[in-house]
């Protein structure tokens, strides 16, 4: 069977396996499909609805083609989300990642520049003078010195370039909007992933189980891809190979409830200025609580605290006692040669 026949067989199967999905996506990573075949693949999956097997197989194909990163697995947390919620808030998960790094937990964040919002994770980190675009050796030094590094996704996933012209032409969400946060070359044991579409929650949790994550939280917070302080958050938790679905509120985390409008952000430099204020202990209550909620979940995943509530309170303590501000002064513009 040639690769086009294999693709057609996959696309006409309403319930393919992860292995079949991987076999269909591997030619894409090698540049073997024409744009017409790529468009057929993406549009058909969009119409059928992506399953956990589709996403797992596609992820395996792109991880197989990815450039490796030396630090992997145990004790590594990634915090990427899907974006696309249209809320244009400050960079909550990125700011929370830095709080967690300052608190002694390792974060290897894989991401990109802004696509759908005014400020992506790379944009705000660049404005905070956190070194980006490091080669793997220097990125390892950065992790060892600071507990944090940022992996610029295009540098590790050159195969994604094969699909970009078609994605731009289609101008609609595709499986790649979901795949992006899953494709860290660090293959982290721990992950928190915010999703804009709550219908994906159980599916993504199943994908994390299949990809070997030890612990993961998939979160949707009242319309945004973060843990919310403006309403309840739905969580799908992977732990001990079991997926549990539940809801938490800001009050259950020991935090106050705030209007979403109080978390409005701007571009990279504007959001970086807001994060500096928060780290210096001068952020608004809404901004502090929003970062603490997400950081608390990250501390919980790392087993630094037994509950998310205690993690959120630890995050507030690290903001108040200057630990996070000191971390930023120490590590911005550092040379990791």
Regions found by a protein language model. Give the residues of each.
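Short amphipathic alpha-helical face segments that pack within enzyme cores
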Residues: 40, 95-99, 290, 294-297
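N-terminal glycine-rich anion-binding loops that anchor highly charged ligand groups
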Residues: 1-2, 9-56, 64-71, 290
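Active-site cofactor/substrate anionic-group-binding motifs, chiefly glycine-
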Residues: 49-115
């Amino acid at each position: 069977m040639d690769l086009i026949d294999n693709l057609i067989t996959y696309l006409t199967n309403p319930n393919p396996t992860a292995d079949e999905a991987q076999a269909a996506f591997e030619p894409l990573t090698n540049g073997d499909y024409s744009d017409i075949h790529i468009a057929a693949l993406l549009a058909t999956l969009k119409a059928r609805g992506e399953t956990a097997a589709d996403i797992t197989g596609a992820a395996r194909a792109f991880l197989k083609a990815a450039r490796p990163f030396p630090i992997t697995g145990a004790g590594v947390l990634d915090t990427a989300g899907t974006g696309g919620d249209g809320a244009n808030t400050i960079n909550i998960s990125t700011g929370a990642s830095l709080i967690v790094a300052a608190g002694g937990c390792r974060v290897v964040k894989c991401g990109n520049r802004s696509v759908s919002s005014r400020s992506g994770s790379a944009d705000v980190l660049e404005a905070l003078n956190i070194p980006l675009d490091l080669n793997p050796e220097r990125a390892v030094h950065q992790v060892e010195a600071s507990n944090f590094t940022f992996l610029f996704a295009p540098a590790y996933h050159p195969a994604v370039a094969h699909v970009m012209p078609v994605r731009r032409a289609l101008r609609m969400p595709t499986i790649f909007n979901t795949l992006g946060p899953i494709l860290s070359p660090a293959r982290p044991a721990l992950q928190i992933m915010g999703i804009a579409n709550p219908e994906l929650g159980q599916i993504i949790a199943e994908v994390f189980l299949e990809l070997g994550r030890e612990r993961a939280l998939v979160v949707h917070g009242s319309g945004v891809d973060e843990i919310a302080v403006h309403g309840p958050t739905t969580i799908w938790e992977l732990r001990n190979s079991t997926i549990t679905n539940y809801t938490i509120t800001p009050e259950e985390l020991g935090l106050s409830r705030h209007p979403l409008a109080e978390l409005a952000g701007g571009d990279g430099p504007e959001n970086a200025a807001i994060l500096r204020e928060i780290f210096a202990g001068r952020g608004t209550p809404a901004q502090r609580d929003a970062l603490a909620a997400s950081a608390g979940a990250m501390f919980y995943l790392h087993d630094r605290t037994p509950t998310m509530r205690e993690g959120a309170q630890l995050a507030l303590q690290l903001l108040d006692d200057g630990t996070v501000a000191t971390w930023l002064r120490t590590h911005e513009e550092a040379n990791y040669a």
